[in-house]
Amino acid sequence: MSVPANGNSSRAYLHDFLARAGLEVRPGERVLDAGAGRAQYRRLFAHAQYETADFLAVKGKTYAQPTYVCDLTAIPVEDGRFDHVVCTQVLEHLPEPGRALAEFHRVLKPGGRLWLTAPLFYAEHEQPYDFFRYTQFGLRRLLEDAGLTVVELAWMEGYLGTLSYQARVMSRALPPDAASWGGGVKGRAAGLGARVARRLGRHAADWLADLDRRHKFVRKGLPKNYQVIARR
């Protein structure tokens, strides 16, 4: 069943991607959710042996207690333990992404699959653990250097999803006060314009996110994120 955008088509498309992963995981197979955070997608792998890894270092972030508290460049398991590794919206937070991908290669069984998403366009977050953004060519290079074969590399959301995000940022970032625009008559006019733009931005963000779920345009523009399936 299609998940509605609810103002953020990226989350809906991410759910679709992981639901697809869940369908491809056979009962009893072992799955590692690398950088699992709250392990919010655990239920999609209820039929599998689901394990998690995270480093629990971001202040103020809520975590589910992981199976392994570790750096993703040094996961404390034997070679070839997992049939699938899931790593979503995590790679940008790793200072050595190539080493982490090589570690995923190590812990995957031959023929095992990596389900990966990573951002191209997104504001800094979870500071100070935010290091990179990725083009499709950068992702392919990193994966191949780690010994993984790219099976699929695609936009996660369409360009309308990126525009929705930009509108959402605008609705929060433009200063609404006259002083921020230099004060005086011009400052008051600019502040009024900013308040109108913020309100319009909120509505535009919701509308564009919903539209992105119905019309995923990928021929031009840019995505917020890429999704990748790679094989060991």
Task: For every predicted segment, state its role.
Residues 5-9, 92, 218:
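Short, surface-exposed alpha-helical recognition segments that flank or form part
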Residues 2, 6, 88, 127:
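Conserved short-loop catalytic and cofactor-binding motifs
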